[in-house]
Structure formats: C-alpha cells, structure tokens
Amino acid sequence: PDIVTPESLNSEAGIQTLRAGSLGDLAVAMSGSAAGHGATTGLIVMSGLMADEYAYSGTFPTRREADTRNLQDINSDVNTIYGNLHRSRTGAETTVDLLADFGGNPEIESEMQSVTGYAYVMFAETFCGGVPFSKAPADGGELIYGEPLTTEQMFNQAIIWFDQAIANAGSNDKLANLGRVGKARSLLGLGQMDAAAAEVAAIPTDFVYNIEQSDNSRRQENGIYIMSTVRRQFSIADGKGGNGLMFRSSMDPRTPWDGGTEFGQDDITLYYNQLKYDSSNAPVVLASGTEARLIEAEAAANADDATTVEDIHNALRATIGLSDLDLSGISGDDLLLAHFSERAFWLFSTGHRLGDLRRLVDVYGMMPSNVFPWGPYFKGGEYSTNLKFLVPQSESNNPNYVGCLD
C-alpha cells in the first residue's frame, strides 16, 4: 500500500495495474500459489477436500478440517481464500468505476464484471449464506460495509454482473462467452436449468477462458501443482467416504495420476499425485465450451431426457477417444447422478465439485449422506454433516456480520 497508492491508480496505466491485480488475486484465490509459509491454499484444493476430489496427506490442521468438513470460523486457510476472493472482486469493481473517468473501455469492463460475477458464484457455491460484500471506494476512502447476502441473493447478484459483462463484450465472443457460462452457472444454482441451457446454447465447444499462471514469481505459480506434486499434501481421492467417485481406479484420462509408492507430507498417508496440472505455470480453466455442453446435459437430465444426456456426453467423450455411455433405461436420480459423475471427471479440480454436490442436495433434494463423503474418516473420527465453508470470524469487524444465514 505504501508503493501503489490510490492516487497512482487514477490513470489509464493505473487501470491496467488494477486489472492485472484483480486477475492475480483471482488466480491466488482459486488455485493458490507457492508464496507464503507452507505455500498458499486456494479454493480449488480446499473445496476439493470438502468434496470427494482430494484426501489430505499433510499435517496442517486447518486443511484436515476441510477434509472432514469439521470447520471452525477461525480456519486460516479459508480466511485467506475468503480475503483473496474479495480482493479480486473489489479490485475489479474499482477498475470498472475508474474507467468511467477515462471514457470507458467496454472490453476491460466486461472482463472485470465477469471477474466480479465469478467471485459471487464462488462464494455462493462454497460458502454458507451470510457473506457481506463491502465496497472499497476508488479514491481510497473509508470502507463501506456490506450487508450479508443469502446464497440465493449471491447467485442473483452474480447474474446482474454477468448481464453487464455480456452487454459490454460487444463483438468479443470470448468475453461474451465468459459471461454467459458464468450466468448459466448461477442459474443452475438457482434451479433454473432450462434458462441456463438456453444461455450457453450458442457457445462453441472449443471455447476456453483460462486463469493464467506463471513462473515469474512464487505468487503467480499454480498452487494446485505446488500443493500436490511439490508438497504432497493433497492426494487424488478414490471412493472417498463411500460416496466419492473413483477418480483413480477408473483410470480415466480426464483425471490422470501417478504414485501410491510413497507417503505424503504427513509420512503416514500413501500419496497419489494428480497430473492434470503438471507444472507450476499450468493454466486453470475458469469457463469453457465443455462446461456449456455439460450445462445443457444437466437441463436434459432434469427433464428426464436420457437420450439427449447420452448424446451430449458421448459427443464430448468422442473428442478424447472415450467409449460411448449407454444410458438407456436410466431415469430420475440415477440419470442425474450419471450426469454429475461425467461432469465431475470433465471439471475435476476446477472448483466445481463442492458446488455440484451442494446442488444435488439443495436443488435436487438428495440426502447429503448419499452424495457427500460420509461416515468414518480414514484418519479417525467422522465426516461432519457440514457442507460448506463458514463466513470467517475475521469478518466480525463488519458491524453487519451475522455469521452463517443458511
């Protein structure tokens, strides 16, 4: 703060600095980084522990809390993710605000509005309701404390930002599609499956928008790679807690791995290394045409249209040489679970799985004990019935803070 002052950002060059900072904060919030004591965990690996993607093979108690879902509101890893998501959001909002003083730049506005929308989505999918969204004035004035929002309100706020992003994208299809996938993802969270499918219908399957990582600094390195391959703390799971998917034993090319011959960082847990991110500069997909097709498939599954679900999935599987699925005779919850299984393999370790499992419970009405890891925990104790990150106690400096609403 003593190097980059609010006054120095109030220029066209400053706007580019703010944009880069917001994208950097989003990258750290999502994938983590090599910086910090023991590196920095991101939402992707921590939410993967809360779900069935990863098992913890390290010694940090805050990360083991996520593996069992037995979280405290003083969990430092969750607090870091929470702060980085908010920093990314407020940086993007400030960028949009300052652009108005320089005649505007619709493409930068669109990208930053989508970044803001994705922050709301990530909070809605992974945290409990009750997250306040405070405003940091562009002139460096006092923080304007936000009111806590329910999960539904967070998804609705995301849609408002994505609508603005789509409108400002103009002829830039990549930015328009980024906003459309984000809006559709929000609509899924609200249970509006047909509207979500309609939103992504025109997106080509080969579309992709990446969160970029780099070897330029430790902060820019891919934290998923650092936490798994380098530090051996996050082991790719297999049938976690009884309900988890077989991410290893399926030998599926979408979840490549190696290992099983040495222990993790804790020296007691056999370690299985993910290979999806094979270097410290491997990018992370934020939105894609593949996700667009999966959204369409979910709408079809919700309508009990097994033929369409099968056609969409087999077209995707053919792109990487996988054999066809046969979903004939499958309906209802079984069809939904077949779809969600495929979706989990395509979107493995991208920050979707916890939100997907919560949607199976909150939108589709399935029992948590039938979809989340459940029962005895492999290091002793039980998996918690909690399904979400808590609003950190650090937010209690906000006079509107109430903890979790839902």
What label would you give each PLM region?
Residues 1-43, 325, 365-406:
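Membrane-proximal, proline-rich intrinsically disordered regions
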Residues 19, 89-92, 96, 155, ...:
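Inward-facing hydrophobic residues that define packing positions of alpha-helical scaffold repeats
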Residues 50, 60, 159, 191-290, ...:
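Hydrophobic-face positions in mid-chain alpha helices that act as interaction patches
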Residues 58-126, 164-173, 280-284, 302, ...:
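Conserved, well-structured interaction surfaces
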